[in-house]
UniProtKB/Swiss-Prot annotation:
The lineage of its organism: Bacteria, Pseudomonadati, Chlamydiota, Chlamydiia, Parachlamydiales. Homodimer. It is an enzyme of class 5 (isomerase). Its EC number is 5.4.99.12. It comes from Protochlamydia amoebophila (strain UWE25). Gene3D superfamilies: Pseudouridine synthase I, catalytic domain, C-terminal subdomain, Pseudouridine synthase I, catalytic domain, N-terminal subdomain. This is tRNA pseudouridine synthase A 2. Substrate binds at Y125.
């Protein structure tokens, strides 16, 4: 295609490192990572890229989002031996091949050392909740319906306890073949935003997250909001390092990867 040219230079000198910012609706995907269980964001994007570039590529992502989780600002990269001279045309061509629930928002040439995971300094996730008795159908695929009164003041108090550096073992689900060297993570900020139609957005920003940590924090905040847990329970939950002490895991469909910071 006319926006790429095959270089005559050696592989090491001709390799370009391309960073993509992508957004996707997670409903149809079994998460970011390739899996025999069903379609993944990674495989869908890889297939379209290889169709354009005409060579095998490997993708790395800032976050391996779970099945059903959405993204507004996922960052991925790939190496190519093609010289992509017109990034805007490249984006248009790639989007024309991709399903409409997966979009390329931007593309950028990066230094060879750039890695979307290793160079990431923080990620921000947004989780949406509707606590009205009846949820509008348009919100159903993208927010957790909790049709009961919530004590927002108590939830805000709990947030202040969770911010900072802690051992978040109690907020980590077990995952086969995933072993952490430690469970200490730093939550930089949590904001509770009240939206229209009795909806909430919980924004959580941190340097790194454990498996399902964000969704378990949200589930715990909901338990506090409905009075099933108390604000005073948070320190003992953290100290327990016991997943059963914290709240329920919030469902995947309310979660968005919002921003990745470098």
């Amino acid at each position: 295609m006319d926006y790429t040219t095959q270089s005559d230079l050696s592989l090491s000198k001709s390799m370009q490192n391309i960073k993509l910012k992508i957004a996707y609706d997670g409903q149809a995907y079994f998460g970011w990572q390739k899996t025999p269980a069903g379609p993944s964001v990674e495989k869908t994007l890889q297939n379209s890229l290889e169709q354009i570039l005409q060579h095998t590529i490997s993708l790395q992502a800032a976050s391996r989002t779970d099945k059903g989780v959405h993204a507004r600002g996922q960052i991925v990269n790939f190496l190519t031996t093609k010289s992509i001279t017109d990034l805007q045309k490249f984006i248009l061509s790639l989007n024309s091949l991709l399903p409409t629930d997966l979009r390329i928002l931007s593309a950028e040439k990066m230094p060879s050392t750039f890695h979307p995971t290793l160079n990431c300094v923080a990620k921000e996730y947004c989780y949406y909740i509707c606590y009205d008795f009846v949820q509008l159908p348009e919100y159903r695929p993208y927010s957790w319906h909790c049709p009961f009164p919530l004590m927002l003041g108590k939830m805000t108090q709990a947030i202040s306890v969770l911010i900072g550096e802690h051992d978040f073992s109690a907020f980590c689900n077990f995952k086969k073949n995933v072993n952490y060297t430690d469970y200490i993570r730093r939550v930089q900020a949590i904001h509770l935003e009240v939206l229209n139609h009795k909806r909430l957005c919980i924004r959580i920003k941190g340097n790194h997250f454990l498996y399902k940590m964000v969704r378990n924090i949200v589930g715990t905040l909901i338990y506090i909001g409905k009075g099933k847990l108390m604000v005073e329970d948070i320190p003992s939950i953290l100290q327990s390092q016991d997943r059963k002490m914290a709240g329920v895991t919030a469902p995947a469909h309310g979660l968005f990867l919002q921003t990745v910071l470098y």
